[in-house]
Amino acid sequence: METKYNPQDIEQPLYEHWEKQGYFKPHGNTSKESFSIMIPPPNVTGSLHMGHAFQQTIMDTLIRYQRMQGKNTLWQAGTDHAGIATQMVVERKIAAEEGKTRHDYGRDAFIDKIWQWKGESGGNITNQMRRLGNSVDWERERFTMDEGLSNAVKEVFVRLYKEDLIYRGKRLVNWDPKLRTAISDLEVENRDVKGSMWHLRYPLADGVKTAEGKDYLVVATTRPETMLGDTGVAVNPEDPRYKDLIGKEVILPLIGRRIPIVGDEHADMEKGTGCVKITPAHDFNDYEVGKRHQLPMVNILTFDGDIRQSAEIFDTNGEASTACSSEIPEAFQGLERFAARKALVAAFDELGLLEEIKAHDLTVPYGDRGGVVIEPMLTDQWYVRAAVLAKPAVEAVEDGRIQFVPKQYENMYFSWMRDIQDWCISRQLWWGHRIPAWYDANGNVYVGRTEAEVRSENNLADDVVLNQDEDVLDTWFSSGLWTFSTLGWPEQTPDLKSFHPSSVMVSGFDIIFFWIARMIMLTMHFIKDEDGKPQVPFNTVYMTGLIRDEEGQKMSKSKGNVIDPLDMVDGISLEALLEKRTGNMMQPQLAEKIRKRTEKQFPNGIEPHGTDALRFTLAALASTGRDINWDMKRLEGYRNFCNKLWNASRFVLMNTEDQDCGFNGGEMELSLADRWILAEFNRTVKAYRDALDGYRFDIAANILYEFTWNQFCDWYLELTKPVMNGGSEAELRGTRHTLVTVLEALLRLAHPIIPFITETIWLRVKALKGINDDTIMLQPFPEFNAAQEDTLALNDLEWIKQAIIAVRNIRAEMNIAPGKPLEVLLRDATAEAQRRVEENLSFIQTLARLESITLLPAGDKGPVSVTKLIEGAELLIPMAGLIDKAAELDRLAKEVAKLEAEIGRIESKLSNEGFVARAPEAVVAKEREKMDGYAVAKTKLLEQQAVIAAL
């Protein structure tokens, strides 16, 4: 083996070998239990980020663990066509390179352009996934716009439409005026901004006056431009100021429209003036109020967000209405919405109807891709009736067919599902699954899988002109079918039978509604088991938190705190890292701040750590469902762990290769250390498997670390040296056999989390055990064996460790050189302690570096010594001649004086009332903590002084 562990040399060639050999494929033996995971499809436009690395490490750990248990294992990969994101990427590309828009190309040619882009750049993220060691069956890779998946999408749409679970309706949606499409709530970014609240006077009609004698009401609004579409004013029915006005009317200024005053609990008596203008066509809350009170909807905006020439009027069912005039004053027609705001406020002011303007903090919705303010817009869209689909999906979680890990996410799921709204599934884009609906010249709609099917089913002659709906489906609609469409549905394929329901879905909690819930609803509606019962898409949902930076901030380009997982694998220079973080920024003014922060955090760039260290860190930080603060020090620690495992393996190989390791017969005698490490490893296997079975990857990683570093490397390898240096043939054979047995099994145990280093070492170790197989990936996973429990060995060796640690502690406390041989006395030793010493003298003497161990006769107190209590005895080290008493007392006195000075400094700081009052609580607490630490250290030094003074 190479003397130095260098992940760069081993990882990529090994992965290419695995993929070429087909080790990632299911073995196909359907008599064995299946285990499958469908990867949450990343956007085809995307690059691998920390969230992907985190979730994929968890998935690959599970897949490798289950594969090693002999299961028929499938990890299905794929990418999402990502409607808006992909369309924008290609639009920007043709604008930059050719100065063209998609409209210059036309729909079909532009879509061809996107397919061309996907062919060139779409594989970027899957190549990055390979770098993580993901054991995905790449031959089955899917794309949400593949022909098979497109057929599944059409099938689902047509069936739902025929069951009256899809309909077309005019309702409010989040509208992006820049991209000119409806967008989902997930694509809306709510930003806190400092804005204004305008207080406007609306004159009361018919000479009516308020309780205070005023002939107007004052409404407060943050969006005065929408007043052109007002169709009511709401007051709280319990509000004594206005309850007598319910049923009366106000005159809408500038328009002259009479609109009713309605009593509705949406109006908050404590907020603003207590009067709320109602604009059902431009506000989600007002839309609901309008429905309750049968108010017409007046749409005043174009799809670009400009004021229309004349308004559109609809009733609460979305049908065209003549309930009020569609006139809009000429002065405002065609104005951009925010220009209209200024003009309207000025017009109110001129009429004396602007009561006041107050500064107001508010939350404004922005499109996360278009970057402009989102408008609630009344549009014709396609909807899924979600309540019908939600009922069985709720029951599946209630009765435990689907388990959430951690369990608390069930409540989040239930709260949304039990109050579910119909789902808007249409988008005004070109890239995506085009809606399989056609219209004739009279506006009649026909839904079918193809135009030919529509004509045939509806007996439409060839001369009847049909035009397909221009809209495409929401990306979440096609990804909602992911678990079964990727397995060949609507065909009843063998894969669907073998791998569905899938075993686990690993996902972020932020898409629990957008994706997880919709997968459950759609799968249960379309996939039935042999008894005709709805089938769930997966048995377990493992929810992850977000990965944040070291300060707990969300990673984002604008904060300049994004860490690319592959930069931690391969390393990156400071210069390249700065370019990555500050190049092509949407807000270049932030670049200097980001530069300074990056230079401070990574003065020398990022060192290469290798994939295994990254995976180990991600597993170790995976505490269930919580957000994770990334920690570079942990990454360094796990890189050191890999190094430790490498060096330990080299030690084992140096002592076992070309030696008799007892695998071909011959007498073997196991030492206590051999028996202990076998028993310790057996227990480790049980705890580790329990952790993985319970999705506690953090606990599993810590168990692996603790056993490998502390038990195997720091104790067992040291304990083999007395045998290696002077054992009999049988003892040597026993220890070599144990070294190889434990290392080989440990590599199998660690493989799911750290696949590259374990395979590399295993390929070298396997020959010693006579294994001829080509890969560790397909080796059996270690199993706990109750018959291998050896409590005596565990207890005896723990006692020996205790004795050795006691000697080492005395050396450290008394400043005795580590290499100086010591005499040890045992006082008042029980028979058990005496047995342990006699049977294991060589272990204790070698590891504690002792000249001798003497058992004192009963009643003999022994010379003046430093003592430590161990189980069943008192351990003494006589100090005579070991230390220079005067020099040691002098050294301790100086240490005590130094601590007293520090304690005094902090005491005076804490007695200063000004400091305590002004300093942040955390700073004061830190000072108190420091003082407590110094006090404990001082007490220990004084105890040592007393011992030495008595010598």
From Swiss-Prot:
It is found in: Cytoplasm. The keyword Secreted does not apply. PROSITE patterns: AA_TRNA_LIGASE_I. It is an enzyme of class 6 (ligase). InterPro entries: aa-tRNA-synth_I_CS, aa-tRNA-synth_Ia, Anticodon_Ia_Val, M/V/L/I-tRNA-synth_anticd-bd, Rossmann-like_a/b/a_fold, tRNA-bd_arm, tRNAsynth_Ia_anticodon-bd, Val-tRNA_synth_C_sf. GO terms for biological process: valyl-tRNA aminoacylation. SUPFAM superfamilies: Anticodon-binding domain of a subclass of class I aminoacyl-tRNA synthetases (SSF47323), Nucleotidylyl transferase (SSF52374), tRNA-binding arm (SSF46589), ValRS/IleRS/LeuRS editing domain (SSF50677). ATP binds at residue 557. A motif ('KMSKS' region) lies at residues 554-558. GO terms for molecular function: aminoacyl-tRNA deacylase activity; ATP binding; valine-tRNA ligase activity. GO terms for cellular component: cytosol. Its main location: cytoplasm. It catalyses: tRNA(Val) + L-valine + ATP = L-valyl-tRNA(Val) + AMP + diphosphate. Residues 880-914 form a coiled coil. The keyword Coiled coil applies. A motif ('HIGH' region) lies at residues 42-52. ValRS has two distinct active sites: one for aminoacylation and one for editing. The misactivated threonine is translocated from the active site to the editing site. Catalyzes the attachment of valine to tRNA(Val). As ValRS can inadvertently accommodate and process structurally similar amino acids such as threonine, to avoid such errors, it has a 'posttransfer' editing activity that hydrolyzes mischarged Thr-tRNA(Val) in a tRNA-dependent manner. Belongs to the class-I aminoacyl-tRNA synthetase family. ValS type 1 subfamily. Monomer. This is Valine--tRNA ligase.
